[in-house]
Amino acid sequence: MELCFNEMTVMKNGTLPEDIALCAQAGFSAVELRKGTLLRYLRGGGTLEALRQTLEEQHVRAASLNALESVSFQTKAGGRMLRELSEWCFAACRVLGCGCMEVIASFNVPEGISAAAICREAADSLLRLSDAAADYGVRLALEFMVMPGSSVRTFAQCAEILEAV
């Protein structure tokens, strides 16, 4: 068993390198990086290469990057933005040695859409993303969200979508 730290639990209390060092000190061998924290680190002058070095020095593995959100029911413009963001995330994962990108289905489902249609759309979205992710050696993990408006709210829904993929 591997202890993995979910960075979401401290997302505003420190810097990414500090979080990684604290993970190592607490005995965690892996960390689930948060996309927002990674972007804040990079905007502050950090680099992906420096972060990878920090991970290596601390003997902490980047287990996953959380998350590409609203991957289903995209408009044309939203789909283009999602493709650009996903390519960047997959490239970042490759640099960081992170083999998994979490994805979250849409929160904006058109009125009257059936559960079967949600399943098909989410499965199709995962298939489109998985082709690009594979080019970077990245796997996708579908995360369900038990929140109002979420189109995928249960483990059973995730399993059904993955069966359709």
Task: Give short role names for the model-derived ranges.
Residues 1-3, 60-63:
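Transmembrane beta-strand segments of Gram-negative outer membrane beta-barrel proteins
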Residues 1-15:
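Boundary/entry segment of secreted carbohydrate-active catalytic domains
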Residues 5, 23, 31, 55, ...:
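Conserved, mostly hydrophobic/aromatic
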Residues 6-10, 34-38, 67-70, 106-108, ...:
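Active-site beta-loop-alpha junctions enriched in small/polar residues
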Residues 29-35, 61-65, 101-102:
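Short, well-structured secondary-structure segments
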Residues 17, 54-57, 74-165:
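Active-site acidic/histidine proton-transfer and metal-coordination neighborhood
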Residues 17-36, 96-97:
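Catalytic domains of carbohydrate-active enzymes, especially glycoside hydrolases
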Residues 32-56, 105-114:
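Glycine-rich, proline-tolerant flexible connector loops at the mouths of alpha/beta enzymes
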